[in-house]
Design a protein with these regions (language model features):
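Gly/Pro-rich interdomain helix-loop hinge
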Residues: 74-125
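Catalytic-loop motifs flanking and including active-site residues across diverse enzymes
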Residues: 17, 21, 66, 85-89
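A general alpha-helix detector
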Residues: 24-28, 51, 69-73, 89, ...
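Carboxylate- and glycine-rich phosphate/diphosphate-binding segment that chelates Mg2+/Mn2+
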Residues: 1-62
Length: 125
């Protein structure tokens, strides 16, 4: 998500691929919540992880992984796992970014979470 919310915000293929990867993660996590041994869902998550880490999603984007750097310190101090630490830090970052980036967050709501924009402002999305 840090790459997705990085600049530039205009449409580019990296953002489109990133949205597809995030939708796949959401879909397959939902499957695994009820069927933890589902091979297809696990393999799709592995593929999504590879896509997220191989650099293709960063092409054309300015990336900032300060949340990850902060989490490494938090994890070292508290011994929490990396994902749990990021789950605490990211919402704070996104609340900070939202006022100047409502269009990007609206796109995220629509294209990743499938939220219908009808009757909603960008900020409401």
């Amino acid at each position: 998500m840090e790459t997705y919310f990085g600049k530039p915000d205009e449409n580019n293929l990296s953002d489109d691929i990133n949205e597809a990867v995030m939708r796949s993660v959401i879909c397959n996590i939902r499957v695994l919540l009820t069927d933890k041994d589902n091979y297809e869902a696990r393999s799709e998550l592995a593929w999504a992880s590879a896509m997220a880490e191989n650099g293709i999603l960063k092409i054309g984007k300015v990336t900032d992984f300060q949340c990850h750097m902060i989490e490494h310190q938090l994890g070292a101090y508290t011994n929490c796992n990396h994902g749990a630490g990021l789950a605490v830090i990211h919402p704070v970052l996104y609340r900070h970014l939202l006022p100047a980036n409502t269009a990007r967050f609206a796109r995220f709501a629509q294209n990743v979470w499938g939220i219908d924009p009808a009757g909603k402002s960008e900020l409401k999305l």
